[in-house]
A protein has these predicted regions:
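N-terminal, positively charged nucleic-acid-binding surface of large information/translation enzymes
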Residues: 8-104
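Short catalytic-loop micro-motif centered on adjacent basic/acidic residues
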Residues: 61-62, 106-110, 222-224, 380
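Structural preference for alpha-helix termini/caps and helix-kink/transition segments
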Residues: 264-267, 271-397
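The substrate-binding groove and active-site-proximal loops of carbohydrate-active enzymes
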Residues: 76-83, 107-113, 197, 225
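Short, glycine/charge-rich beta-strand/loop segments that flank catalytic centers
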Residues: 65-69, 91-94, 104-119, 137-146
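Alpha-helical recognition segments enriched in aromatics with Gly/Pro capping
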Residues: 1-31, 46, 117-323
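Short glycine/serine- and small hydrophobic-enriched flexible loop segments
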Residues: 50, 212-213, 367
Length: 397
Protein backbone atom coordinates (compact mmCIF):
# COMPACT_ATOMS: atom_id res chain seq x y z
CA UNK A 1 0.00 0.00 0.00
CA UNK A 2 1.11 3.56 -0.67
CA UNK A 3 0.43 6.74 1.30
CA UNK A 4 1.35 10.34 0.56
CA UNK A 5 4.14 11.36 2.92
CA UNK A 6 4.19 15.11 3.48
CA UNK A 7 7.88 14.92 4.41
CA UNK A 8 8.86 13.63 0.96
CA UNK A 9 6.03 15.14 -1.08
CA UNK A 10 5.29 11.83 -2.83
CA UNK A 11 3.36 8.62 -2.34
CA UNK A 12 5.58 6.10 -0.61
CA UNK A 13 5.26 2.39 -0.03
CA UNK A 14 4.10 1.74 3.52
CA UNK A 15 5.60 -1.49 4.77
CA UNK A 16 6.54 -2.43 8.31
CA UNK A 17 8.34 -5.50 9.62
CA UNK A 18 6.23 -5.39 12.75
CA UNK A 19 2.45 -5.70 12.76
CA UNK A 20 2.33 -3.25 15.67
CA UNK A 21 1.84 0.38 14.66
CA UNK A 22 1.82 3.63 16.61
CA UNK A 23 -0.41 6.40 15.23
CA UNK A 24 -0.71 9.91 16.63
CA UNK A 25 -3.27 12.54 15.65
CA UNK A 26 -3.34 16.07 16.95
CA UNK A 27 -6.59 16.51 18.83
CA UNK A 28 -8.63 19.67 19.18
CA UNK A 29 -8.03 22.63 21.41
CA UNK A 30 -11.16 22.22 23.50
CA UNK A 31 -12.64 25.69 23.74
CA UNK A 32 -15.61 25.62 21.32
CA UNK A 33 -18.12 23.33 19.65
CA UNK A 34 -16.99 20.56 17.33
CA UNK A 35 -17.20 21.87 13.78
CA UNK A 36 -17.15 20.73 10.18
CA UNK A 37 -13.37 20.93 9.91
CA UNK A 38 -13.06 18.51 12.82
CA UNK A 39 -15.36 16.06 11.06
CA UNK A 40 -13.19 16.14 7.92
CA UNK A 41 -9.96 15.52 9.81
CA UNK A 42 -11.08 12.82 12.23
CA UNK A 43 -13.25 10.86 9.78
CA UNK A 44 -10.30 10.83 7.36
CA UNK A 45 -7.95 9.56 10.05
CA UNK A 46 -10.49 6.96 11.13
CA UNK A 47 -10.39 5.47 7.63
CA UNK A 48 -6.61 5.11 7.88
CA UNK A 49 -6.90 3.38 11.23
CA UNK A 50 -9.71 1.07 10.08
CA UNK A 51 -7.85 0.18 6.88
CA UNK A 52 -4.63 -0.68 8.70
CA UNK A 53 -6.59 -2.80 11.17
CA UNK A 54 -8.35 -4.56 8.27
CA UNK A 55 -4.91 -5.32 6.82
CA UNK A 56 -3.89 -7.09 10.01
CA UNK A 57 -2.00 -4.40 11.90
CA UNK A 58 -2.40 -3.89 15.63
CA UNK A 59 -2.83 -0.14 15.92
CA UNK A 60 -2.11 1.93 19.00
CA UNK A 61 -3.90 5.22 18.41
CA UNK A 62 -3.03 8.20 20.61
CA UNK A 63 -4.95 11.47 20.45
CA UNK A 64 -4.42 14.51 22.61
CA UNK A 65 -6.68 17.23 23.89
CA UNK A 66 -5.08 20.65 24.15
CA UNK A 67 -6.60 21.81 27.42
CA UNK A 68 -3.97 24.47 28.17
CA UNK A 69 -3.95 27.31 25.64
CA UNK A 70 -4.71 30.98 25.18
CA UNK A 71 -8.17 30.06 23.91
CA UNK A 72 -9.07 27.80 26.83
CA UNK A 73 -7.99 30.45 29.33
CA UNK A 74 -10.05 33.12 27.57
CA UNK A 75 -13.07 30.81 27.42
CA UNK A 76 -12.86 29.92 31.10
CA UNK A 77 -12.60 33.60 32.01
CA UNK A 78 -15.58 34.43 29.82
CA UNK A 79 -17.75 31.75 31.45
CA UNK A 80 -16.43 32.35 34.96
CA UNK A 81 -15.34 28.75 35.57
CA UNK A 82 -12.11 26.87 36.19
CA UNK A 83 -10.16 26.20 32.99
CA UNK A 84 -10.42 22.42 33.29
CA UNK A 85 -14.14 22.55 34.05
CA UNK A 86 -14.44 24.58 30.86
CA UNK A 87 -12.38 22.21 28.70
CA UNK A 88 -14.00 19.02 30.00
CA UNK A 89 -17.35 20.24 28.69
CA UNK A 90 -15.96 20.51 25.17
CA UNK A 91 -14.01 17.25 25.43
CA UNK A 92 -17.28 15.44 26.09
CA UNK A 93 -19.04 17.29 23.29
CA UNK A 94 -16.24 16.33 20.89
CA UNK A 95 -16.26 12.65 21.86
CA UNK A 96 -20.05 12.48 21.63
CA UNK A 97 -19.91 13.88 18.10
CA UNK A 98 -17.12 11.51 17.06
CA UNK A 99 -19.26 8.59 18.24
CA UNK A 100 -22.21 9.88 16.21
CA UNK A 101 -19.92 9.93 13.16
CA UNK A 102 -18.97 6.27 13.87
CA UNK A 103 -15.33 7.11 14.49
CA UNK A 104 -13.49 4.52 16.55
CA UNK A 105 -12.15 5.53 19.95
CA UNK A 106 -8.46 6.19 20.50
CA UNK A 107 -6.40 3.67 22.43
CA UNK A 108 -5.72 6.54 24.80
CA UNK A 109 -6.61 10.22 25.04
CA UNK A 110 -3.98 12.47 26.58
CA UNK A 111 -4.29 16.00 27.90
CA UNK A 112 -1.62 18.67 27.91
CA UNK A 113 -2.33 19.38 31.57
CA UNK A 114 -1.28 15.83 32.48
CA UNK A 115 2.24 16.36 31.11
CA UNK A 116 3.14 19.74 32.59
CA UNK A 117 5.85 18.20 34.80
CA UNK A 118 7.60 16.57 31.84
CA UNK A 119 7.24 19.70 29.70
CA UNK A 120 8.77 21.81 32.48
CA UNK A 121 11.62 19.32 32.91
CA UNK A 122 12.56 19.47 29.21
CA UNK A 123 12.22 23.26 29.20
CA UNK A 124 14.73 23.54 32.05
CA UNK A 125 17.16 21.23 30.24
CA UNK A 126 17.00 23.42 27.14
CA UNK A 127 17.65 26.51 29.27
CA UNK A 128 20.64 24.85 30.90
CA UNK A 129 22.09 23.78 27.54
CA UNK A 130 21.71 27.26 26.04
CA UNK A 131 19.19 26.11 23.44
CA UNK A 132 16.51 28.21 25.15
CA UNK A 133 16.40 31.66 26.72
CA UNK A 134 14.13 33.47 29.15
CA UNK A 135 12.33 36.79 28.64
CA UNK A 136 9.64 38.59 30.59
CA UNK A 137 7.14 36.91 28.24
CA UNK A 138 8.31 33.36 28.81
CA UNK A 139 10.94 30.83 27.81
CA UNK A 140 11.69 30.45 24.09
CA UNK A 141 13.77 27.90 22.23
CA UNK A 142 16.17 29.04 19.52
CA UNK A 143 15.29 27.72 16.07
CA UNK A 144 17.71 28.32 13.20
CA UNK A 145 16.87 28.84 9.56
CA UNK A 146 18.25 25.42 8.64
CA UNK A 147 16.00 23.69 11.19
CA UNK A 148 12.84 24.45 9.21
CA UNK A 149 11.60 23.14 5.88
CA UNK A 150 11.47 19.38 6.43
CA UNK A 151 7.69 19.31 5.97
CA UNK A 152 7.07 22.56 4.13
CA UNK A 153 10.18 22.14 1.96
CA UNK A 154 10.61 25.91 1.64
CA UNK A 155 13.10 28.40 3.01
CA UNK A 156 12.79 30.50 6.13
CA UNK A 157 11.31 33.57 4.48
CA UNK A 158 8.69 31.55 2.60
CA UNK A 159 7.66 29.58 5.67
CA UNK A 160 7.32 32.78 7.66
CA UNK A 161 4.85 34.00 5.06
CA UNK A 162 2.79 30.84 5.39
CA UNK A 163 1.45 31.59 8.83
CA UNK A 164 2.01 32.89 12.31
CA UNK A 165 0.76 31.83 15.70
CA UNK A 166 -0.44 33.91 18.63
CA UNK A 167 1.20 31.28 20.81
CA UNK A 168 4.59 32.29 19.40
CA UNK A 169 4.24 36.03 19.97
CA UNK A 170 6.64 37.85 22.26
CA UNK A 171 10.09 39.42 22.40
CA UNK A 172 11.97 36.73 20.51
CA UNK A 173 15.52 36.73 19.15
CA UNK A 174 14.25 35.25 15.88
CA UNK A 175 10.76 35.05 14.31
CA UNK A 176 11.01 31.25 14.32
CA UNK A 177 11.89 30.87 17.98
CA UNK A 178 8.99 29.20 19.73
CA UNK A 179 7.44 29.41 23.17
CA UNK A 180 8.20 26.58 25.59
CA UNK A 181 6.83 28.10 28.79
CA UNK A 182 4.60 31.15 28.91
CA UNK A 183 3.41 33.52 31.62
CA UNK A 184 0.19 33.01 33.59
CA UNK A 185 -3.00 34.03 31.81
CA UNK A 186 -6.11 35.49 33.36
CA UNK A 187 -8.74 32.76 33.52
CA UNK A 188 -6.20 29.98 33.07
CA UNK A 189 -4.39 27.66 35.44
CA UNK A 190 -0.69 28.16 36.03
CA UNK A 191 2.06 26.05 37.57
CA UNK A 192 4.97 26.82 39.86
CA UNK A 193 8.02 24.73 39.03
CA UNK A 194 11.50 25.06 40.54
CA UNK A 195 13.80 26.73 38.04
CA UNK A 196 11.01 28.32 36.00
CA UNK A 197 8.81 31.35 36.53
CA UNK A 198 5.14 30.65 37.33
CA UNK A 199 3.43 29.90 34.04
CA UNK A 200 2.00 27.52 31.48
CA UNK A 201 3.39 25.19 28.80
CA UNK A 202 3.61 26.18 25.14
CA UNK A 203 1.57 24.44 22.45
CA UNK A 204 4.24 22.80 20.26
CA UNK A 205 6.21 21.15 23.05
CA UNK A 206 2.97 19.76 24.50
CA UNK A 207 2.47 17.49 21.48
CA UNK A 208 6.12 16.47 21.26
CA UNK A 209 6.06 15.34 24.89
CA UNK A 210 2.65 13.65 24.77
CA UNK A 211 3.33 11.65 21.61
CA UNK A 212 6.82 10.53 22.62
CA UNK A 213 5.63 9.57 26.10
CA UNK A 214 2.88 7.30 24.80
CA UNK A 215 4.39 5.79 21.63
CA UNK A 216 7.68 4.19 20.68
CA UNK A 217 9.74 6.37 18.35
CA UNK A 218 9.79 6.86 15.51
CA UNK A 219 6.02 7.28 15.33
CA UNK A 220 4.79 5.21 12.41
CA UNK A 221 2.22 7.77 11.20
CA UNK A 222 1.51 11.27 12.48
CA UNK A 223 -1.72 12.85 11.20
CA UNK A 224 -3.24 16.33 11.16
CA UNK A 225 -4.85 18.95 8.96
CA UNK A 226 -2.66 20.75 6.42
CA UNK A 227 -3.10 23.91 8.48
CA UNK A 228 -0.96 22.24 11.16
CA UNK A 229 2.07 21.61 8.94
CA UNK A 230 3.49 25.02 9.79
CA UNK A 231 4.24 26.04 12.40
CA UNK A 232 2.95 23.22 14.59
CA UNK A 233 4.24 20.01 13.04
CA UNK A 234 7.46 21.60 11.79
CA UNK A 235 8.19 22.84 15.30
CA UNK A 236 7.04 19.64 16.97
CA UNK A 237 9.60 17.71 14.93
CA UNK A 238 12.37 20.25 15.61
CA UNK A 239 11.72 20.13 19.34
CA UNK A 240 11.92 16.33 19.30
CA UNK A 241 15.44 16.62 17.92
CA UNK A 242 16.42 19.34 20.39
CA UNK A 243 15.38 17.29 23.44
CA UNK A 244 17.30 14.29 22.17
CA UNK A 245 14.54 12.06 20.82
CA UNK A 246 16.22 11.55 17.45
CA UNK A 247 14.16 10.51 14.42
CA UNK A 248 10.63 11.41 15.44
CA UNK A 249 8.25 10.11 12.77
CA UNK A 250 8.34 7.97 9.61
CA UNK A 251 5.16 9.13 7.85
CA UNK A 252 3.47 12.52 8.07
CA UNK A 253 -0.05 12.54 6.64
CA UNK A 254 -2.25 15.62 6.34
CA UNK A 255 -5.85 16.04 5.30
CA UNK A 256 -7.21 18.92 3.23
CA UNK A 257 -9.67 21.43 4.62
CA UNK A 258 -13.28 22.30 3.91
CA UNK A 259 -14.19 25.00 1.39
CA UNK A 260 -17.38 26.81 0.49
CA UNK A 261 -18.52 28.45 -2.75
CA UNK A 262 -16.12 31.33 -2.15
CA UNK A 263 -13.10 29.11 -1.63
CA UNK A 264 -11.29 27.66 1.35
CA UNK A 265 -13.16 27.93 4.63
CA UNK A 266 -11.02 29.85 7.06
CA UNK A 267 -10.74 28.42 10.55
CA UNK A 268 -13.14 31.01 11.92
CA UNK A 269 -15.72 30.40 9.18
CA UNK A 270 -15.41 26.63 9.47
CA UNK A 271 -15.98 26.84 13.21
CA UNK A 272 -19.25 28.64 12.62
CA UNK A 273 -20.55 25.48 10.91
CA UNK A 274 -20.92 23.34 14.03
CA UNK A 275 -21.79 19.67 13.87
CA UNK A 276 -24.81 20.25 16.08
CA UNK A 277 -26.16 22.58 13.39
CA UNK A 278 -25.44 20.12 10.59
CA UNK A 279 -26.99 17.19 12.44
CA UNK A 280 -30.27 19.09 12.67
CA UNK A 281 -30.52 18.81 8.87
CA UNK A 282 -28.40 15.77 8.04
CA UNK A 283 -27.84 12.48 9.91
CA UNK A 284 -24.24 11.92 11.07
CA UNK A 285 -23.97 8.82 8.86
CA UNK A 286 -24.82 10.93 5.81
CA UNK A 287 -22.16 13.50 6.68
CA UNK A 288 -19.63 10.67 6.96
CA UNK A 289 -20.81 9.38 3.57
CA UNK A 290 -20.37 12.85 2.08
CA UNK A 291 -16.85 13.26 3.42
CA UNK A 292 -15.83 9.88 2.01
CA UNK A 293 -16.91 10.87 -1.49
CA UNK A 294 -13.94 13.27 -1.45
CA UNK A 295 -10.28 12.34 -1.09
CA UNK A 296 -8.80 13.06 2.32
CA UNK A 297 -6.06 15.28 0.84
CA UNK A 298 -8.50 17.30 -1.29
CA UNK A 299 -10.29 20.43 -0.23
CA UNK A 300 -13.85 19.29 0.35
CA UNK A 301 -16.59 21.61 -0.93
CA UNK A 302 -19.40 22.44 1.43
CA UNK A 303 -22.79 23.93 0.65
CA UNK A 304 -26.14 23.04 2.21
CA UNK A 305 -27.32 21.78 -1.20
CA UNK A 306 -24.32 19.49 -1.70
CA UNK A 307 -24.81 18.02 1.74
CA UNK A 308 -28.52 17.51 1.07
CA UNK A 309 -27.74 15.58 -2.12
CA UNK A 310 -25.31 13.39 -0.17
CA UNK A 311 -28.00 12.72 2.45
CA UNK A 312 -30.39 11.63 -0.27
CA UNK A 313 -27.85 9.32 -1.93
CA UNK A 314 -26.77 7.81 1.39
CA UNK A 315 -30.39 7.09 2.27
CA UNK A 316 -30.98 5.47 -1.13
CA UNK A 317 -27.87 3.27 -0.91
CA UNK A 318 -28.78 2.26 2.61
CA UNK A 319 -32.06 0.63 1.58
CA UNK A 320 -30.51 -2.39 -0.15
CA UNK A 321 -27.75 -2.55 2.46
CA UNK A 322 -30.25 -2.96 5.28
CA UNK A 323 -32.17 -5.63 3.37
CA UNK A 324 -29.01 -7.62 2.66
CA UNK A 325 -27.27 -7.31 6.02
CA UNK A 326 -30.03 -9.19 7.85
CA UNK A 327 -28.63 -12.28 6.10
CA UNK A 328 -25.64 -14.05 7.68
CA UNK A 329 -22.60 -12.99 5.63
CA UNK A 330 -20.26 -15.16 3.61
CA UNK A 331 -16.98 -14.21 1.96
CA UNK A 332 -17.70 -12.12 -1.17
CA UNK A 333 -14.38 -13.26 -2.65
CA UNK A 334 -16.02 -16.63 -3.29
CA UNK A 335 -18.70 -15.01 -5.46
CA UNK A 336 -17.70 -14.54 -9.12
CA UNK A 337 -19.72 -11.34 -9.45
CA UNK A 338 -18.43 -9.79 -6.24
CA UNK A 339 -14.77 -10.86 -6.19
CA UNK A 340 -13.77 -8.10 -8.66
CA UNK A 341 -15.50 -5.55 -6.43
CA UNK A 342 -13.46 -6.67 -3.44
CA UNK A 343 -10.27 -6.24 -5.46
CA UNK A 344 -11.31 -2.79 -6.66
CA UNK A 345 -12.20 -1.74 -3.14
CA UNK A 346 -8.93 -2.94 -1.61
CA UNK A 347 -6.86 -1.45 -4.43
CA UNK A 348 -8.59 1.90 -3.91
CA UNK A 349 -7.79 2.02 -0.20
CA UNK A 350 -4.24 0.79 -0.80
CA UNK A 351 -3.71 3.75 -3.13
CA UNK A 352 -3.47 6.53 -0.54
CA UNK A 353 -6.94 5.88 0.89
CA UNK A 354 -8.82 6.63 -2.33
CA UNK A 355 -12.28 6.70 -0.77
CA UNK A 356 -13.98 8.27 -3.84
CA UNK A 357 -13.00 5.17 -5.84
CA UNK A 358 -14.17 2.96 -2.98
CA UNK A 359 -17.53 4.73 -2.98
CA UNK A 360 -17.92 3.95 -6.68
CA UNK A 361 -17.56 0.29 -5.72
CA UNK A 362 -20.38 0.80 -3.23
CA UNK A 363 -22.60 2.22 -5.96
CA UNK A 364 -21.89 -0.81 -8.16
CA UNK A 365 -22.61 -3.11 -5.24
CA UNK A 366 -25.97 -1.40 -4.77
CA UNK A 367 -26.94 -2.28 -8.35
CA UNK A 368 -25.96 -5.94 -7.88
CA UNK A 369 -27.77 -6.08 -4.54
CA UNK A 370 -30.92 -4.62 -6.06
CA UNK A 371 -30.92 -7.19 -8.84
CA UNK A 372 -30.43 -10.12 -6.48
CA UNK A 373 -33.17 -8.92 -4.16
CA UNK A 374 -35.57 -8.78 -7.10
CA UNK A 375 -34.50 -12.23 -8.31
CA UNK A 376 -34.45 -13.82 -4.83
CA UNK A 377 -30.74 -14.49 -5.39
CA UNK A 378 -27.98 -15.32 -2.94
CA UNK A 379 -27.62 -12.38 -0.56
CA UNK A 380 -25.08 -13.91 1.83
CA UNK A 381 -21.97 -12.76 -0.10
CA UNK A 382 -23.63 -9.37 -0.67
CA UNK A 383 -24.02 -9.12 3.09
CA UNK A 384 -20.35 -10.00 3.41
CA UNK A 385 -19.40 -7.21 1.04
CA UNK A 386 -21.46 -4.69 2.97
CA UNK A 387 -19.72 -5.91 6.12
CA UNK A 388 -16.40 -4.92 4.57
CA UNK A 389 -17.73 -1.42 3.97
CA UNK A 390 -18.92 -1.35 7.56
CA UNK A 391 -15.53 -2.51 8.84
CA UNK A 392 -13.27 -0.26 6.75
CA UNK A 393 -15.39 2.81 5.98
CA UNK A 394 -17.62 2.83 9.04
CA UNK A 395 -20.77 2.85 6.93
CA UNK A 396 -24.00 0.97 7.75
CA UNK A 397 -22.99 0.69 11.42
Amino acid sequence: MRFFNTASGIKEEFSKDSKKLGLYICGPTVYSETHLGHAKSYVSFDILKRWLTYKGYHVTHIQNFTDVSDETAKGALREGVDEFTFTQKYEKEFLDNMALLSNTYASKYTRASEFVGKIAEETKKLLESGEAYQTDQGVFVRINQDDHGKLLRVNLEESLAEGTSDVDSGPKESPHDTLLWGPPLEGGNSWEVDGLPPGRPGWHLECTIMSSSELDLPIDIHWGGIDLIYPHHETEMILAEKIGLGHYCDFWMHNGLMEDAEGKLSKSRSERVSLSQIFEECPPASLRFYLLTHHYRAFTPYTPDSLLRACQEAEKLGINAVDCMVVDPTDPRDDDELAPLVSRFENALADDLDTPAAMNVLRDLDVIAGNRIKQNGNLAPISGMYSIFECVLGLFS
